[in-house]
């Protein structure tokens, strides 16, 4: 049983990869990330195309509520032009939420479906792969630099990382180290927070699924309510993690854009 369990868990934690080592490309992560993006674009474009000024349908009402909610958050936290930040925040929240929500699909369903087509390894949750959250966080990192330069200019960027917090040339090396660590900590923490929570959630689903393989009928039966309870709780987790990623992105960009005020 132990060996079977270990192999089962290892199989579910293996990627469909092209290449080896650092340069390996996780094809399953790419596919499901793109699929989540396509779902988001399809739903929102369909609502926009069929939008009516009369009595809206349920889907249009839901989309309008989400858009209004995100726009309100951006308005309250980003004190600058919202024409780019609001759509960016909306895209981040919806995209991350959809990628997270794939975790609610039974752990064996998609791998077994893929196995019918000769695909022996498949991990369906992109945000449980560090490469996806890290890729998004790197984009946020460059946006932070962009909005810092846009707000203060390139010279202001240099001053920010050499004359802050100690405004004296003697402390330039110290300031540079402190500010660089602070800057790099933002995308790293952003990525690992999302990855850690989603990886843990995926692993718990796998461990619950292992219970169905037990020889003890009582243990098998216990897996059903545990799976249901964890799935219900996980709905909160996937929503909260999407919100946190979006909210921290807004806050980081707001700080970068308004550094002249500090």
Curated annotation (Swiss-Prot):
SUPFAM superfamilies assigned to the protein according to its UniProt record, in alphabetical order: F1F0 ATP synthase subunit A
InterPro entries given in the database record: ATP_syn_F0_a_bact/chloroplast (IPR045082), ATP_synth_F0_asu (IPR000568), ATP_synth_F0_asu_AS (IPR023011), F0_ATP_A_sf (IPR035908)
Pfam families per record: ATP-synt_A
Membrane disposition: Multi-pass membrane protein
Domain of life: Bacteria
GO terms under cellular component: plasma membrane; proton-transporting ATP synthase complex
Localization per Swiss-Prot or TrEMBL: Cell inner membrane
Keywords attached to this entry: ATP synthesis, Cell inner membrane, Cell membrane, CF(0), Hydrogen ion transport, Ion transport, Membrane, Transmembrane, Transmembrane helix, Transport
One GO BP: proton motive force-driven plasma membrane ATP synthesis
Membrane-spanning ranges: 24-44, 84-104, 129-149, 165-185, 194-214, 228-248
Keyword Ligase: no
GO MF entry, a single one: proton-transporting ATP synthase activity, rotational mechanism
Protein function: Key component of the proton channel; it plays a direct role in the translocation of protons across the membrane.
Assembly, per entry: F-type ATPases have 2 components, CF(1) - the catalytic core - and CF(0) - the membrane proton channel. CF(1) has five subunits: alpha(3), beta(3), gamma(1), delta(1), epsilon(1). CF(0) has three main subunits: a(1), b(2) and c(9-12). The alpha and beta chains form an alternating ring which encloses part of the gamma chain. CF(1) is attached to CF(0) by a central stalk formed by the gamma and epsilon chains, while a peripheral stalk is formed by the delta and b chains.
NCBIfam families attached to this UniProt entry: ATP_synt_6_or_A, PRK05815.1-1
Entry's family note: Belongs to the ATPase A chain family.
HAMAP family reported in the protein's UniProt record: ATP_synth_a_bact (MF_01393)
Protein known as: ATP synthase subunit a
Gene: atpB
């Amino acid at each position: 049983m132990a060996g079977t369990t270990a192999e089962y868990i290892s199989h579910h934690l293996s990627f469909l990869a092209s290449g080896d080592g650092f340069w390996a490309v996780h094809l399953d992560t790419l596919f499901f990330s793109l699929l989540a993006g396509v779902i988001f674009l399809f739903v929102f474009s369909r609502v926009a195309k069929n939008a009516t000024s009369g009595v809206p349908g349920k889907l249009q009402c839901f989309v309008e509520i989400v858009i209004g909610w995100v726009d309100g958050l951006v308005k309250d936290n980003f004190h600058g032009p919202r024409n780019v930040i609001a759509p960016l925040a909306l895209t981040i929240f919806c995209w991350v939420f959809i990628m997270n929500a794939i975790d609610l699909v039974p752990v064996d369903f998609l791998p077994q479906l893929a196995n019918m087509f000769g695909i022996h390894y498949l991990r369906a949750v992109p945000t449980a792969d560090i490469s996806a959250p890290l890729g998004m966080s790197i984009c946020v990192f460059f946006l932070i630099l962009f909005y810092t330069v846009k707000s203060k200019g390139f010279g202001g960027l240099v001053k920010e990382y050499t004359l802050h917090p100690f405004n004296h040339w003697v402390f330039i090396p110290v300031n540079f180290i402190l500010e660089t660590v602070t800057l790099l900590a933002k995308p790293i923490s952003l990525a690992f927070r999302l990855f850690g929570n989603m990886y843990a959630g995926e692993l718990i689903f796998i461990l619950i699924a292992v219970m169905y393989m037990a020889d003890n009928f009582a243990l098998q039966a216990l897996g059903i309510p545990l799976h249901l309870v964890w799935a219900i709780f996980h709905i909160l987790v996937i929503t909260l993690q999407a919100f946190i990623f979006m909210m921290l992105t807004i806050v980081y960009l707001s700080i970068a854009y308004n550094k002249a005020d500090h």
